[in-house]
Design a protein with these regions (language model features):
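Von Willebrand factor
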Residues: 1-45, 53-94, 97-101, 126-140, 151-161, ...
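Short, well-ordered amphipathic alpha-helices
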Residues: 13-21, 74-84, 113-116
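Short beta-strand-loop
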Residues: 28-58, 138-144
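Von Willebrand factor A/integrin I-like adhesion domains
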Residues: 134-185, 189, 195-196
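P-loop NTP-binding core
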Residues: 18, 86-90, 193
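VWA/integrin I-like adhesion module and closely mimicked acidic/polar interface patches used
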Residues: 7, 86, 104-143
């Protein structure tokens, strides 16, 4: 993702953080982490309480591979390190929500296929995948989750609507790890298409 699309993602992230900061419950319970994946996989923002989030600058290469599998491996390590499970003696963290956005397909397909069962073992309240742009492939995302969406227009208005929906999803997704009911997300905006 380069140029206007990545700038639009940045605007959308800023709008999401601003929106969440107006929700007193989110201020007390939401934490945000950002992992980027292209030819390098990086934790740009470790799991950080919402009130302390300073969005980092997201830089992308001109072109190159999309290491989605390596990103999910790093995600599993970060979840294991940063998220506290509930025990009989101690209340744990809220169940995390995973929002994965890609404008391509996994370049490291074998790693991607191998890590999917590990991701599913983690205690996510929901895993939502977004195929952004016409070159994004939904088939690999459907292996990860049933909740796959497409965003065909990569402008700031579309990304703002997408991240507004993400904010609303975070609001309904704050549940303790160990809850068993499926999370029902709010309906997506018209800019976001459901993949069936």
């Amino acid at each position: 993702m380069k140029g206007e699309p990545i700038e639009s993602v940045k605007v959308g992230l800023e709008a999401m953080v601003s929106s969440l900061r107006t929700d007193p419950f989110a201020l007390e319970s939401a934490n945000i982490s950002i992992i980027t994946f292209d030819r390098e996989v990086k934790v740009l923002l470790p799991l950080t309480p919402l009130e302390d989030v300073q969005l980092p600058n997201i830089e992308t290469p001109e072109s190159g591979p999309t290491h989605t599998g390596a990103a999910l491996e790093l995600l599993c390590k970060q979840i294991d390190k940063e998220v506290t499970l509930s025990t009989p003696e101690k209340k744990g963290d809220w169940m995390p929500l995973l929002f994965l956005m890609t404008d391509g397909k996994p370049s490291d397909l074998q790693v991607y296929n191998n890590i999917i069962p590990e991701v599913k073992k983690r205690h996510f309240a929901s895993i939502v995948a977004c195929a952004a742009g016409m070159k994004a492939k939904v088939e690999p995302l459907k292996q990860l989750t049933d909740q796959v969406y497409t965003l065909d227009t990569l402008d700031s208005s579309s990304f703002k609507q997408f991240f507004k929906w993400v904010s609303a999803s975070i609001g309904v997704g704050n549940r303790s790890i160990g809850a068993t009911d499926d999370l029902v997300l709010p309906p997506p905006p018209e800019e976001v298409n459901v993949v069936i």
